Regions:
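Phosphate/pyrophosphate-binding loop motifs in nucleotide- or prenyl diphosphate-using proteins
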Residues: 1-217
Length: 217
């Protein structure tokens, strides 16, 4: 009969260029709302690529926090009337305070031109820069949607702050990577210049010690 079997992922509606935002409603995939929701979902995926190479548990936790907020934002765009999908103003405050913290360090260590570094200083910063480009594109889609459909002000502010946070995070990752490289380069030099340990000759009547567990380990 051409209908999908129960339990399958596909419905066939998308074959005609349509998709569902709410149960029972279908809109064109070219609709501004679909573009904005898709942009938020792309941003979640891009941040997942950053998280794959993140070894710092604290920063990994921040990425999960942002991904979770973006999913709430996407759901809110799909179902704006329900009022169920909202996030606290603390999420915006978190981005602002963490951005200020990183910018403060970068300004102190790199000077006022810290933003000018090219992407690619390390893998994590490159992925952060790519994620920032995705977020900025999603923000533009959100603004395009707002011209036709009302978008909550907090959503627009959040996407704008998120782009700033990712810029600061990318340059911060570059700085941390360079600090680690400098530290690694200094360590061999320190080892070479360290004074050699004095060798004390054993007494003539010393008895050789066999390979016990203590002196093997």
């Amino acid at each position: 009969n051409g209908k999908p079997e129960k339990g399958t992922l596909y419905t066939g509606n998308g074959d005609k260029g349509l998709t569902s935002l709410l149960p029972g409603s279908q809109v064109s995939k070219a609709d501004e709302r679909v573009a904005a929701i898709g942009g938020a979902e792309e941003s979640v995926a891009a941040l997942g690529l950053v998280r794959c190479v993140t070894v710092c548990p604290d920063f990994a936790g921040k990425l999960v926090r942002v991904q979770t907020t973006l999913r709430t934002l996407a759901a809110g765009l799909a179902d704006p009337r329900s009022g169920k999908f909202v996030f606290s103003s603390e999420e915006i405050a978190f981005l602002e305070s963490d951005t200020d913290r990183m910018v403060g360090v970068l300004a102190d260590k790199r000077g006022s031109d810290w933003q000018g570094a090219l992407p690619g200083g390390c893998e994590q910063s490159a992925r952060l820069d790519a994620a920032r480009s995705t977020v900025r594109r999603a923000e533009r889609a959100l603004i395009a949607m707002d011209r036709r459909y009302a978008v909550p002000g907090a959503f627009k502010v959040y996407m704008n702050r998120l782009g700033d946070w990712l810029l600061a995070a990318a340059r911060y990752a570059d700085w941390l990577s360079e600090e680690e490289k400098d530290k690694a380069a200094r360590e061999p030099v320190a080892a070479e210049t360290a004074p050699a340990a004095a060798v004390v000759p054993a007494p003539a009547d010393a008895v050789p010690v066999g390979p016990t567990v203590e002196n093997v380990l």
